[in-house]
A protein has these predicted regions:
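Surface-exposed amphipathic alpha-helical segments
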Residues: 219-253
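Beta-propeller fold detector
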Residues: 14-22, 70-76, 133-139
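Acidic/hydrophobic-patterned starts of short beta strands in beta-sheet-rich repeat architectures
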Residues: 1, 37-49, 94-106
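Loop/turn-rich, solvent-exposed surfaces of beta-rich toroidal or solenoidal domains
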Residues: 38-66, 151, 155-161
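Surface-exposed beta-loop interaction hotspot
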Residues: 38, 121-148
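Repeat-based blade/solenoid architectures
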Residues: 20-34, 76-90
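Secretory pathway targeting signatures of secreted, lumenal, and periplasmic proteins
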Residues: 151-201, 207
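Structural motif
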Residues: 1-7, 52-65, 108-128, 132, ...
């Protein structure tokens, strides 16, 4: 239960209460409380808990008519309807528009629903009535510290594969141009961490996306990008690429 108190004559008085999906014990593990904003510009609290270490459940709390309300709580189940596979990503303003978006993990077309590599993240905003709207989609490589805002046409049309060696970890995006042929690679993003990373970063076809803690991130446009309807340029990849920062969560001490 979440309580809303008001200050009156120097004392706090309980104004209203609302059910939330997770207990404090559950929130203290991998949970996070985010102070944010709805599409209607109203302030809101986004409370994310993780059930069984696998499912992210987010409640969205806001004042409606002066009463605390859980905008996404199901009257039937008593639990938030904003549930998806946990991907170590929490609500944030993903696109800098001043509105807080909730990450919703979705299986990529043809992907393994239980495999983190095969997941994209849809970012969902809410208004004061609890109406959801998808803002954009990203591919988050949390383990390697980066994410890519998926270009127009990509979310429902790409597969992803991961390759790893001691000094290089690569994520390759493939098109679905033909289900009867092998997947066609479009873009590869590689994290270089070995002693040869500076030399490898400027290998033919590669372009640098960013650097962080001894790691160089590079992109490489592949053959499937050339004639594809949703092809991208190097500059578009750079603009869509971001490093993942460290954030506080309810379980941090």
């Amino acid at each position: 239960v979440a309580d809303c108190y008001v200050s009156k004559n120097g004392a706090l008085t309980l104004r209203s209460s609302v059910l939330v999906s997770m207990t404090m014990a559950e929130l203290s593990q991998q949970g996070k409380v985010t102070v944010g904003t709805l599409r209607s510009s109203d302030p809101a609290l986004f409370i994310t808990g993780v059930a069984d270490g696998a499912r992210a459940i987010t409640d969205v709390l806001a004042l409606r008519g002066g009463e605390l309300t859980n905008l996404v709580l199901s009257a039937i189940t008593g639990v938030s309807g904003e549930v998806s596979r946990f991907s170590s990503v929490y609500p944030m303003d993903i696109n800098g528009d001043g509105v807080t978006e909730v990450p919703r993990t979705v299986s990529l077309q043809g992907g393994d629903a239980d495999h983190a590599v095969s997941q994209r993240v849809d970012w969902i905003s809410y208004d004061a009535s609890g109406t959801a709207s998808r803002v954009l989609s990203t591919y988050h490589d949390v383990a390697d510290g980066w994410y890519l805002q998926l270009p127009e046409g990509w979310p429902e049309r790409v597969w992803v594969g991961r390759s790893a060696s001691p000094d290089e970890i690569g994520i390759t995006f493939y098109t679905d141009s033909s289900r009867e042929e092998s997947y066609v690679p479009v873009l590869r993003i590689t994290a270089l961490s070995g002693s040869e990373r500076e030399r490898l970063a400027v290998r033919t076809g590669r372009f640098i996306l960013g650097r962080n803690d001894g790691v160089i991130y590079v992109g490489e446009l592949l053959k499937g990008n050339q004639d594809w309807k949703y092809s991208v340029t190097e500059d578009e990849v750079r603009a869509s690429f971001s490093l993942i920062g460290t954030e506080w969560s309810a379980g941090d001490n």
